Swiss-Prot record:
GO cellular component terms attached to this protein's record: plasma membrane
Principal location class: membrane
Source organism: Rickettsia prowazekii (strain Madrid E)
Name of the protein: NADH-quinone oxidoreductase subunit H
Assembly notes: NDH-1 is composed of 14 different subunits. Subunits NuoA, H, J, K, L, M, N constitute the membrane sector of the complex.
Length: 339
């Protein structure tokens, strides 16, 4: 019995504890990201934001969660009930399992696999299925149109994201996310300079990938009421909401890992090494999340034709040129990484 526990149950228990240790803080971060968004946008619009529930409004996310938990879940009469219930669950679960390969600090990662980049790309591609299923199962023209918009938007910008990631792989020579971070320690400054415009394209692409302003066309209130989640209430709506914000944090962590050095200090100074890598990781992710909120508070929504034109006629040729340029420069300067 003891041998069985040591061989089979103990490893499973350790994995389960690791999953819980990542999931619970992440859900809390998602809850308080909604609070931060309302406060930041309120300050930018010269108003207070939530400030009544608890000191400085810090209990507002808990009040919102309790409210949504006790609301009545209403399923439309003509909806496909099984798919209607499954759609928000799929979206939320996919937004969580992407964290399995994100390194929080040196050696602190749930699954340090050698194809971490491909894993993240696969998960981000699958996340649109929950939205498509929601649009189809709702049996509503607004929800279905929002789902179609989301799938077209994802396809358009996933291509540019993939090409940008190829430039990172060319400079680091590995698909392992921890390896990418460690490789950034020794990259010459001119390679970082070449990757700067690619990182900007990547960040704009993840804005579109997560359906955030100025690319929130799948849920445009003025056109589609609320888009793919128009028929959802109670915990179904809450799971979509949590999935969107969990995806925001995930893509911010991905951008941090690929372009900002992950858990490494921002400058190569010896006294910064005494600060834990987890602090730098959280600081960089927090900065990118603030950029998400800043953009939402200041920029108007794109028209749908402008969104498609930007993806196919601007970003696609630009990233293709970037791949050719980076690979050519690395080849002729003999800086291609050894694989």
């Amino acid at each position: 019995m003891i041998e069985y526990f040591c061989e089979y149950m103990f490893p499973l228990t350790v994995i389960a504890l690791k999953v819980v240790a990542i999931t619970i803080p992440l859900i809390l971060c998602v809850a308080y990201l909604t609070y931060a968004e309302r406060r930041v946008i309120g300050l930018m619009q010269l108003r207070r934001g939530p400030n009544v529930v608890g000191p400085f409004g810090l209990l507002q996310p808990i009040a919102d969660a309790v409210k949504l938990l006790f609301k009545e879940p209403i399923i439309p009469t003509d909806a496909d009930k099984i798919l209607f219930i499954l759609a928000p669950i799929i979206t939320f679960v996919l937004s969580l399992i992407g964290w399995a390969v994100i390194p929080f600090s040196s050696g602190v990662v749930l699954a340090d696999i050698n194809v971490g980049v491909l894993y993240i790309l696969a998960i981000s591609s699958l996340s649109v299925y929950g939205i498509i299923i929601a649009g189809w199962a709702s049996n509503s023209k607004y929800a279905f149109l929002g789902a179609i918009r989301s799938s077209a938007q994802m396809i358009s910008y996933e291509v540019s994201m993939g090409l940008v990631i190829i430039t990172v792989l060319l400079t680091t020579g590995t698909l392992n996310l921890s390896g990418i971070i460690e490789a950034q320690k020794t990259l010459p400054w001119w390679i970082d300079l070449m990757l700067l415009p690619m990182s900007i394209v990547f960040f704009i692409s993840v804005l579109a990938e997560t359906n955030r302003l100025p690319f929130d066309l799948p849920e445009a209130e003025s056109e589609l009421v609320a888009g793919y989640n128009v028929e959802y209430s109670s915990m179904g709506f809450a799971l979509f909401f949590l999935g969107e914000y969990a995806n925001m944090i995930l893509v911010s962590a991905m951008t941090t890992t690929l372009f900002l050095g992950g858990y490494l200090p921002p400058f190569n100074l010896s006294f910064l090494d005494c600060i834990p890598g987890f602090f730098w990781f959280v600081f960089k992710v927090g900065f990118l999340l603030f950029c998400f909120l800043w953009i939402r508070a200041t920029l108007p929504r794109y028209r749908y034709d402008q969104l498609m034109r930007l993806g196919w006629k601007v970003f696609l040729p630009f990233t293709l040129f970037g791949v050719v340029l980076v690979s050519s420069v690395l080849f002729y300067t003999d800086n291609l990484p050894s694989v």
